[in-house]
């Protein structure tokens, strides 16, 4: 589809934006190979870092029509409650995808503990569920 997709990981201590690049981490490389387009803020030519750690004020770079977010990962940051504070923050509420109601939480185990074929299929399932328009 002709949309930009933003993706962010919310942990108990920071934000992480895994960049779209030829050297992207597993699930984000699958997005790239599936033709999912990311906004300019979330792209890299592969020569620099593969990850940004923006402050709350810098989240305005997440200009995607659709926003996927991951809470935590291998740690127990889901229980910190920080993501609930972030989702209620006016800066988050101003993001285009949030305003449009196109925000989807995806499973941290699938996206951050990526472990091969099963995880790859789950990422593809998430793409189909959240990005590909229905009939």
Map each language-model feature to its residues:
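Second-shell loop/turn segments in exported
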Residues: 15-18, 46-49, 110-117
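Histidine- and/or cysteine-centered catalytic micro-motif in compact active-site loops
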Residues: 8-12, 44-46, 72-74
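Structured C-terminal subdomain patch of bacterial secreted/periplasmic proteins
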Residues: 62-135
């Amino acid at each position: 589809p002709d949309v930009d997709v933003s993706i962010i990981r919310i942990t108990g201590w920071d934000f992480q934006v895994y960049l779209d690049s030829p050297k992207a981490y597993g699930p984000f490389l699958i997005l790239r190979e599936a033709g999912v387009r990311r906004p300019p803020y979330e792209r890299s030519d592969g020569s620099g870092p593969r990850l940004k750690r923006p402050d709350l004020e810098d989240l305005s770079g997440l200009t995607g029509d659709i926003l996927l977010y991951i809470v935590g990962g291998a740690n127990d940051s889901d229980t910190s409650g920080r993501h609930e504070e972030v989702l209620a923050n006016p800066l988050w509420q101003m993001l285009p995808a949030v305003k449009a109601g196109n925000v989807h939480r995806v499973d941290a185990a699938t996206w951050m503990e990526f472990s091969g074929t099963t995880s790859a299929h789950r990422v593809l399932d998430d793409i189909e569920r959240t990005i590909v328009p229905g009939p």
